[in-house]
A protein has these predicted regions:
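Adenosine-nucleotide cofactor-binding segment
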Residues: 216-219, 231-299
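Helix-to-beta-strand junctions that scaffold the AdoMet/dcAdoMet cofactor pocket
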Residues: 304-306
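N-terminal Rossmann-fold NAD(P) dinucleotide-binding loop
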Residues: 223-224
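Short N-terminal strand-loop motif that marks the start
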Residues: 3-93, 162-166, 170, 181, ...
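C-terminal substrate-binding/catalytic core of Rossmann-like NAD(P)-dependent dehydrogenases/reductases
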Residues: 268-276, 280-281, 318-369, 380
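NAD(P)H dinucleotide-binding glycine-rich loop of Rossmann-like/cofactor-binding domains
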Residues: 106, 125-214
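Glycine-rich beta-strand-centered segment in the early N-terminal region that forms part
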Residues: 50-66, 79-132, 157, 179
């Protein structure tokens, strides 16, 4: 009887603590915690700081995991954004351990409480009242994200840390309650949103349909997720193009029905014929260019039929100039070209549904995460990403 009373008492304490915005029993918040601070190119060091005081509009999140993005790898290698010193990590997720009294719902209006799992999206400092129904792309273009913020007194500005501090009010943070998704799915939300947005951009051309012949060039994480998004939407005539046979095999598991290894062909003419043969003697109705290689962009026009479409989404940094012949590649073929850059708030909501659908039909999404490292091994994690020895690399806290 005494044991039952203790259990009931503990349950009541946890319920009450969730209502009052404090950490539940057994989840004591320390006074100090660690961040992985990038102090110079190709070097993180773990630094300990006092956790900030949580204000009425703020949220303190215990980090559970964070994917390593190509953007993180580029910043780690060359600091192209000039952010050093910086706490990186923007593909993160974790559990709310404390929140201000004014925090009641997430950006979609879904109730939140201590113990819920969340992800962050964009930061709209210039327009903190923006909602997920404001789809003007110019608003998104000027947004920030946690994990690419300049260092300041808060310190806990990125997901490569023990905790992350989500600032409320006029700071313009957006976040979503994703407690109904498992950890691997939550880590994949941000990169999947990039592809959900790219497919939505492609649909604006009016060319991408259920029976479209589609080429996806590049079978890294972005290209593989692109194939999965297309497959879940009912596009089942997909040709994957890459130079890595293992990645091409994975592409088939994600929904590609044919593959072409460009390493087996000399010259763009031979490669084009191979792509055409893989699609029953036809050029593609639509193509997605998912690499950051300028030569790949130059070549992909050859794979597309007259009047077809192309979505370029591979260049998240300046990868150099690509050379095309505007007459032969674009004008005379009347190619419909769209660029795609990150995502908007609505794309995040769509991404949650995509991940549930992908899991339901058996797509191996979680297998995209090939390497998991603790925070203490973050330098090794970034080096693994640069070496391209896996697909998706993630930092997963104990």
């Amino acid at each position: 009887m005494d044991m039952n009373n203790v259990n009931i008492e503990e349950i009541v304490k946890q319920v009450l603590s969730g209502m009052t915005g404090n950490a539940p029993a057994g989840n004591t918040i320390p006074k100090k915690a660690r961040v992985a601070m990038m102090t110079e190119k190709k070097h993180f060091e773990l630094q300990e700081y006092d956790l900030p005081e949580v204000g009425d509009d703020d949220i303190l999140v215990k980090v559970e995991g964070c994917g390593v993005c190509g953007t993180d790898a580029h910043e780690y290698k060359n600091d192209p954004f000039g952010l050093i010193p910086v706490v990186l990590g923007h593909e993160g997720t974790g559990e709310i351990v404390k929140m201000g009294k004014n925090v009641k719902v997430d950006t979609a209006g879904k109730p939140v409480k201590v113990g819920d799992k969340i992800v962050t999206c964009m930061i709209f400092k210039d327009d903190p009242e923006i909602t997920m129904f404001d789809l003007n792309k110019k608003n998104v273009g000027g947004a920030d994200v946690y994990g690419l913020l300049p260092d300041d007194d808060v310190k806990f500005n990125g997901w490569f840390a023990d905790y992350i501090f989500i600032r409320g009010g006029k700071f313009g943070s957006t976040f979503f309650n994703v407690s109904d998704l498992d950890l691997d799915s939550r880590i994949l939300i941000e990169p999947c949103a990039v592809l959900v947005h790219a497919v939505e951009r492609a649909k604006t051309t009016g060319i991408l349909k259920f029976n479209s012949r589609v080429v996806v060039q590049g079978c890294g994480p972005i290209g593989l997720i692109c194939i999965a998004v297309l497959h879940t939407m009912g596009v089942h005539n997909i040709c994957a193009v890459d130079g890595n046979e293992k990645r091409l095999e994975f592409a088939k598991r994600m929904g590609a029905n044919t593959t072409v290894n460009f390493m087996n062909f000399k010259g763009i003419e031979a490669l084009t014929e191979a792509v055409k043969e893989a699609q029953g003697g036809h050029l593609a109705d639509f193509a997605f260019q998912c690499t950051g290689n300028p030569h790949a962009h130059s070549n992909i026009y050859k794979f597309i039929r007259n009047g077809g479409g192309l979505c370029e989404l591979g260049f998240f940094i300046n990868g150099g100039d690509a050379t095309i012949n505007p007459h032969f590649d674009l004008c005379s073929k009347e190619i419909n070209l769209v660029g795609s850059w990150v995502y908007n708030l609505r794309d995040y909501a769509t991404t949650f549904d995509f991940l549930k659908r992908a899991k339901a039909i058996g797509l191996p999404m979680s297998e995209l995460i090939t390497h998991k490292f603790p925070l203490e091994e973050i330098n090794e994690a970034l080096e693994t990403n640069l070496a391209m020895t896996g697909l998706k690399i993630a930092i997963v806290n104990k």
